[in-house]
């Protein structure tokens, strides 16, 4: 059983002849790819293929299609162009990291916003063939400032788990203080979201409050558990009908692994999350009371029965048909297991959670 993804603006794109159209679909091969169809003849041929994902279709003309994909790594994306005959696929961007694209009509020109974990945003103007025309913003002053302060950088790693006899590598990162000493013992904050099809472990530039903790001597760790995005339909839809169960298992297993590292103070592990991440941090401190000493839960879902149906029923099915999928992951039923310290935060004007 699998849930059906949301339909977005780039799911179906018609060409000017009003007969051919490009469909972004993941159910044919298990990975999100582009396919050419005809109103008259139906399916024609694939435009892209492989064990990687097209993240978005940026624009299309009668002879070319431009798209973003994570072909090089689930942690990164790049901008590509391919002919509408499925031939001549070519990568237009060069930097390894995360690219966002703002195209002109017909992709005659485009603006690229690029960053990675060690490089702040760079904004450049290109023609539709990828040729650099102008650098609009290089953030030179910020880069110079960071170079002089030993700014901590994400270290990416994978955490292996074996589920139902299958080995799965989960993407993670750790941020250490600039003066990290492996002979010392550090407290750890796990930060995560963990929601369906989401990704937090990405090679992109970001500065947040967790970085202030790193400067105060904390380690910050993040993982994308089973059910998150960028790795194909099978991986993403493992959590169908059981939101919160597999993700909690993975997060607790990672925390137990990190607790055993020689430079970690196992008595000072905490977890943070907001919205779905808040739901997860509650589950983790209740079901992983032996490893977490603290949790921060902001705007959490505490029962899927009371969250909006347009989101919940798509991923979890109907409550009448799947009562266990609604109740077993609910932290309300495990509240008596709380041992550590819990900071619960919620806005009084929140019209969502």
Q: What function would you assign to each model-found segment?
A:
Residues 30-35, 74-80, 118-125:
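Structural motif
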Residues 12-20, 58-63, 101-109, 117:
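Blade-terminus and WD-like Trp-Asp/Gly-His loop motifs, strongest in beta-propeller folds
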Residues 100-353:
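Serine-hydrolase catalytic core recognition
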Residues 1-11, 25-26, 37-61, 70-72, ...:
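Multi-bladed beta-propeller domains
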Residues 21, 44, 65, 89, ...:
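Hydrophobic residues embedded in beta-strands of well-ordered beta-sheets
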């Amino acid at each position: 059983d699998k849930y059906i993804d949301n339909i977005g603006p780039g799911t179906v794109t018609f060409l000017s002849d009003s007969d051919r159209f490009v469909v972004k679909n993941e159910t044919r091969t298990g990975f999100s790819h582009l396919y050419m169809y005809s109103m008259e003849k139906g399916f024609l041929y694939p435009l892209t293929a492989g064990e990687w994902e097209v993240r978005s279709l940026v624009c299309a003309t009668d002879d070319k299609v431009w798209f973003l994909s994570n072909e090089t790594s689930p942690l990164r994306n790049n901008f590509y162009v391919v002919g509408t005959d499925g031939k001549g696929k070519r990568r237009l961007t060069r930097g390894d990291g995360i690219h966002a694209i703002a195209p002109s009509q017909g992709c005659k020109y485009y603006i690229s916003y690029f960053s990675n974990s060690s490089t702040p945003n760079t904004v450049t103007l290109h023609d539709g063939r990828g040729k650099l025309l102008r650098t609009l913003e290089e953030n030179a002053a910020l880069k110079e400032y960071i170079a002089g302060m030993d700014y901590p950088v994400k270290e990416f790693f994978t955490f292996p788990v074996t589920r139902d006899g299958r080995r799965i590598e989960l993407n993670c990162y750790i941020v250490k203080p600039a003066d990290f000493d492996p002979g010392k013992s550090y407290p750890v904050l796990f930060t995560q979201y963990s929601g369906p099809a989401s990704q937090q472990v990405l090679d992109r530039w970001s500065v947040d409050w967790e970085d202030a903790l790193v400067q105060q001597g904390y380690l910050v760790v993040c993982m994308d558990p089973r059910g998150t995005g960028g790795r194909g339909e099978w991986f993403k839809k493992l959590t169908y009908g059981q939101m919160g169960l597999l993700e909690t298992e993975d997060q607790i297993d990672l925390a137990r692994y990190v607790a055993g590292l020689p430079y970690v103070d196992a008595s000072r592990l905490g977890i943070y999350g907001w919205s779905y991440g808040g739901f997860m941090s509650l589950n983790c401190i209740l079901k992983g009371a032996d490893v977490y000493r603290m949790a921060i839960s902001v705007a959490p879902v505490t029962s899927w029965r009371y969250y909006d149906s347009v989101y919940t029923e798509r991923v979890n099915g109907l409550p009448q048909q799947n009562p266990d999928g609604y109740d077993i992951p609910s932290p309300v039923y495990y509240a008596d297991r709380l041992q550590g310290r819990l900071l619960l935060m919620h806005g009084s004007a929140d019209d969502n959670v």
